[in-house]
Amino acid sequence: MSDDGHLPPKSSVKRWLVTTNHKDIGILYTATAIFTLVLAGIFGLLIRVQMWESGAFILSDIGYNQVVSAHGLLMVFWFLSPFAFGVANYFVPLQIGADDLAFPRVNALSYWLYFFSIIIFAVSFFQEATFSGGWTMYAPLNVPTVDASSVASVGGFAAVLALVVFTASVTLGSVNFLTTIYRMRAKGLRSRDMPLFSISILLTVWMMLFAFAALLAALLVLSSEHLLATEYFASEEAGGGLLWTHLWWFFGHPEVYIVFFPALGVIAEIVQTFSGRRLVGRKWFIIAMALVAIQSFIVWMHHMFLTSINLPIKTVMMVTTIGISLPFDLMVFALIYTMIKGRIRWKTPFLFALGAILIFIVGGITGVFLGAIVLDYSFRGTYWVTAHFHYAMASAAVGIIGGIYYWYPKMTGKMYNEFLGKVHFVSAFIGFNLLYFPMFVAWETPRRWFHYDAGFTIWHQMATVGAFLFAASFLVMFYNLFMSLYSDRVVDDSPWAYTESTEWTVSSPPPEGNFPGTPSFASGRLEFLGADGGEAQTDGGMADATDAVEQHADHASWWPFMIGFSALWTMIGISGLPTSYSVWPILFALPVFVGALGIIGARRDGFGPIHGLYLGAAMPLLSAFLLVFHAHHGIVSGFVEASNYFYITLFGAVFGAVSFVGYGYESFSVPEPDFAEQWPFKDVKNTKLGMWVFLASDIVLFGALIGAYGFMRINYGWTDWWADASVHMAVWPGLLNTYILLASSFTVVLAMAYARRGSRRGTLGFLGLTFAGASIFLMNKGYEWYEHYIHQGWVFNTDPMASTYYLTTGLHAAHVVVGMLLVLFIIARASKGAYWSEGESADTIEYYGLYWHFVDIVWLFLFPLFYIL
């Protein structure tokens, strides 16, 4: 990174470590996803070799389970969606007329969390044994109290933690895309007028925001079973196994559409371009997509027809499942009719789009069988499901591959080899169908098992041949795209005869700042406006990033990489921590965070009394934690006997604490767009909208945990549950904490009010009171936990009530700690004139207040649940 914060050249490795430019991040996502595809594909080939004949062939029983699990997890999580969002990162800002995503550093952080989550998963293979519980991770088969084999090994837990990091990446990306699309569209570009790919991404990130929050809740509970020995999924009397299935499939079925929707948008763009006409029934196509996005959250129980759910509920889910196919019928017919009405150009992108439609039709039709209760009883757990699932999911991959060919000229300025592109399509299409269609014939083969009836051998051998042909087809693609980079087939702005979207109006590849001026559709056609509001002089799309709005597209930051790197070490360490050491690395990192606020803050703003206070407080705080550690483990013996995983976690947590402070203090300006289409959030700034969206995800997270509490209590017996726990629960600690948090919400409001009045004393005073209130809350909660855990012996796994109490209130306490760390940062900045002095804005305190009010509101639900009802 140069001294002025600009990016190094693309030939430099450093460029790709520090970039925040959306096009660079898109390339990183795409390249990493392709690497994951290769890795998962190798696992897939191992599966097919094992299935060449019935019985053990090249893999042991546990080895086969590990390969099947890794293949599924890598494909579903680390390939399909990131592959699509590599394309989305690159082209959504270009399509909507934005110079970048709303939060460029958050975009980079999202990528690095994704990247390092893959590394965590890869490392799990070298930690005793990796996860082997299947990609659906069904509990209670994967919790230590039930299965102490490789499913519950250190490596198995590391795979779970890798998914936690991946989910964090997805959440950040969802917040970023929603804020960008709602706040940074070109003037005059209404939401419904956006290109269909961008509309599909908008609907996808809404689904991701809520679905992945439910998955995160499930993963946090599963992690607590490994790390803290809680008793959720292992509890038979509280219906723990069924609870996992609900949480998983509430995420899992929307995930099918999360994967397919970006491909659907790509397919629509390609069909329009190569049919030479606008999509027939475009309005209804968009409405149908929106209906599917909504309906996706009310069909999850069709995956649970074999469970003990009563028949009326199953019947309702059968109806909703069949009903969700109707909007897809409309969309498929719209695509087909567009092709009929247009004049088709049989180029490689169109072939892949057409292939994706055909594959999806097969996947959709065969899925209807599984939506019928009676048929599901026969097909569930067989290779019919395997074939259906791959037809549904692979249609997304095939569609996005078509998008790679479609936009390759725009990204590189070079045209791919058309002949090799068609060779790739033909070999891939034949190989795919040869691989998966025989599975419908051999449908009685049980899933996740390599023993089968000898009569199915020919079909499995046919599938194995198809697998190798399908894999070989990608070698053609890789060769074609790589060699085309060095060809002389240079393209202009648009190599296609019919294109409507904005990305085709700039040079290939696009410049750093994307556009030669500010894009606007206000006149009814695309114009690039200069700083004076007049039409800009275009020069093929080249423009220097000279004004404030364009500068951040060329900005660099090390901190997203650093935070992702810290997550790598922290999660690898946590995977091997015993329960007795689980909390200490995080506690020891807190004084480091406070000390870093003093040191980095002094360098950034100049040394002041507040920085001295933070530096002075860090050592006593660390000493206090060491004294408590000594009481539990012994100050010498505790560190001597600690495993390597303890020190790995400690390194990651400390490195992360410093990285977060550096991220917060970095001078990185992203100006608010002042000439954009922003309905319905015109008067809501980017950061405020981003906070709202993030809190919407957090609502689902806590809602899932509260729902888990209710589900388990109803199954356990509502009154029996409280009878077992009432001897441990006193009302007054919870009531006191309720008053404390409500008062702290009031002090945040007063701090914001005084900041807007320009009062330094009032701002700092009420921010300090907010911190004090949070501290008292935690001390009271800590005392309460100490009484329960040490004096009463009511530990994490005493009963289901104890597990739900400690985990749910513990997650809330973690939110309180985050709020305290944030307010310490705000106090440090405010002490040097930020937020309240002339020319400063109090908006940061307002945004912090939104978060803090949410934390308080959550407690208003937890208090009656755990102390009164």
Over which residues does each language-model region extend?
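Membrane-embedded and interfacial regions of multi-pass energy-transducing membrane proteins
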Residues: 2-726, 783, 787-789, 794-797, ...
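Polytopic transmembrane helical bundles with strong interfacial aromatic enrichment
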Residues: 246, 686-692, 735-738, 746-754, ...
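Membrane-helix interface segments
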Residues: 348, 758-764, 797, 801
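Short alpha-helical catalytic segment bearing the HExxH-like zincin motif
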Residues: 691, 695, 734, 805-809, ...
